[in-house]
Amino acid sequence: ATIDPKLQHMADTALADGLETYDRRHGWRGAISTLPLDDNWFDSLKKYKPPLGILDRQIAAVIRTTPKVAYIGLQDGTYGSIHFEDLKWARKRLKRQRIGPSPKSVSDVLSPGDVVTVRELPNIQEDIPDLPRRYSLDQIPNIDGALVAIDPHTGRVLAMSGGYSADRSQFNRVTQANRQPGSAIKPFIYLSALEAGHTPATLILDAPVVVNIPGYGLWKPQNYSGKIYGPSPMRIGLEKSRNLMTIRLAEYIGIDKIISTADRFGLGQRMRPELGSALGSGEVTLLELTSAYAMIANGGLKISPSFIDTVHDRNGNLIFRHDNRKCQECIGPNADPLMPPELPNKKERVADPFYRYQLVSMMQGVVENGTGRRVKLTGRPLAGKTGTTNKSLDAWFVGFSSNLTVGVFVGFDQPRTLGPREGGGSVAAPIFGRFMREAWPILPGAPFKTPPGLEFVRVNRLNGLPAKQGDKNTVLEAFLPGTIPSANDNVIGAGLYENLGEMIPSILFDEDSDDEVREQDISVQDRTN
């Protein structure tokens, strides 16, 4: 098998902790039940089943409360306590994704007779063995998610966590859940633009778009902030996940071209020939999307995810090998044991190294300056993209180092909103960040390879032109020879100004916007709006 036990443990832990963090952020759902504290309370407590497959959780009954401590009895006949600081997270969950005020005492959360789930805390005073055991108030998340980690050079799946608990649900959300990726699909739209001759500095008009879709009526996509920003470099469009820029870009390039690009990465069959596909309206699995990102990470070479390296029969004979390449210099009379082995690279190229490098640079900007800032690891090169769908039903973060590609999805199995201000940057990205931080010592990344022949010019991040002396907001941009921008370059979508009825006030072109400071983006807008 390809699974690495250490990485698998990290994946399970990062996913579980991330789901629990989200769940607690949305409040306390209340006690499992209540029971009368009569002479038979212990027998009544034993009738409750502990959470399946979650060994560190126990069922307990609240026996007595004080303002600072709840005293509990457990199913194994022992007793313990929950201190206020270990339940103060439990703000009451209200309707419509709202939560109540922070509790001020234990009685604001628990009452005698409540049946609850608890988790034992480490004994910080091990020198006092008879000290009553201390617990934290807990609840099992009703949200779920998935994480998968792939070696981008081979396609080997190194870790796969298909949900919070396999005992609770055997549904594997890595391979079986088909969900809308939202803005996580955007790198392939921007790659199509690069292949069409545009650059990360090409200006795209960020302005209202109205699309008449037969059978659906008018579709009016929006940026998350509801604001518009005027002509902005393509890099900004990806870093800040600007929907209006992406739609204009897709309309300019053509959705057929975009689907053709996505098809090389195994995603074309998931996209419909409509502009909504540019914002992630088609459904994918986490494994499909992460495999596509792995092809960006590895330099633009096609890979297929694999779970098995070799298969042997009961006599030890090899009957299957996933990688059938042979090192010709390693066998025969001319084999040199001192020379490192060289395996032929037979992988199909799916992206030109130049355009792939430009895209990776832009995706690094997502982590450094954009919607994925929560995964930033100082001094460690990472690239990726957030994704959040309409009404925040799905949250994604897919990203990579030079040696590891990781995808995270979070959502309810029966889709419903994750809540206000919840999305790829706030829900999925922290899970990715924790896993990547812990996995780095095992698979450290290196700077992404730069193909020869590119020209590097420092440009102004706001207007895409070569930086002038004194410009502060700049970025070192990579260009193919002859593509360095000038003031005479066209703005994609600028001709559509005449259809807006009036010029957009320049005061709305505010770069210090909510789109930039919120770690979230919205993708597919309701077509009936």
Features from the language model and the residues they span:
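Structural recognition of the beta-strand scaffold that forms the well-ordered cores
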Residues: 148-149, 158-160, 202-203, 236, ...
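Active-site-proximal loop and beta-strand segments within enzyme catalytic domains
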Residues: 195-234, 239-243, 251-258, 264, ...
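Acidic/polar loop patches that form or flank catalytic/metal-binding clefts of enzymes
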Residues: 24, 199-206, 271, 302-307, ...
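Active-site Gly/Thr loop motif
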Residues: 357-387
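Short small-residue beta-strand/loop micro-motif enriched in glycine and branched aliphatics
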Residues: 168-171, 272, 415-419
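Soluble, non-transmembrane domains of envelope/secretory-pathway proteins that act on or interact
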Residues: 37-44, 64-68, 76-77, 201-202, ...
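Short coil/turn segments at secondary-structure boundaries
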Residues: 1, 23-32, 250-252, 260-264, ...
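Extended, non-catalytic substrate-recognition/exosite surfaces adjacent to catalytic cores, especially
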Residues: 1-217, 221-223, 235, 278-290, ...
